[in-house]
Amino acid sequence: MARVKRGVTSHAKHKKVLKAAKGYYGRRKNTIRIAKQAVEKGMQYAYRDRKNKKRTFRALWIQRLNAAVREHGLTYSRFIDGLAKSGIVVDRKALSELAIHEPASFAAVVEKAKAALPQNTAKAA
């Protein structure tokens, strides 16, 4: 059996880790052991934040919708209720984009949602 020397493979692995650690501060960018830990931690953060990104963007769309809908005299929750009752199925991202780029079209959607809501006289908004 021939002897296998692993210098080339280990060098390639080290290069790969150091390339991923590029831009890190201190020994994290040039010491293999520390760089490997930093890169792995970075990957954990990236995995976690790919999930959080979805939550964050949904929250942003809801905030934008709430602000846009209040200009038309509704709250976000009443608006969503009105959309459901009127049978309009549009996601929050699309509604948010509509509110920003097509205010006239968004106003029409809000009016449809308002029309589907029962008129509540006991509560003066």
Swiss-Prot record:
Any one of the GO BP annotations: translation
Top-level taxon of origin: Bacteria
A GO MF term: structural constituent of ribosome
GO CC list: ribonucleoprotein complex; ribosome
Keywords from the named record: Ribonucleoprotein, Ribosomal protein, RNA-binding, rRNA-binding
Pfam name, any one: Ribosomal_L20
Keyword rRNA-binding: yes
PANTHER family reported in the protein's UniProt record: 39S RIBOSOMAL PROTEIN L20 (PTHR10986)
Role description: Binds directly to 23S ribosomal RNA and is necessary for the in vitro assembly process of the 50S ribosomal subunit. It is not involved in the protein synthesizing functions of that subunit.
Family: Belongs to the bacterial ribosomal protein bL20 family.
HAMAP family: Ribosomal_bL20
Protein name: Large ribosomal subunit protein bL20
Species whose genome carries this gene: Methylobacterium radiotolerans (strain ATCC 27329 / DSM 1819 / JCM 2831 / NBRC 15690 / NCIMB 10815 / 0-1)
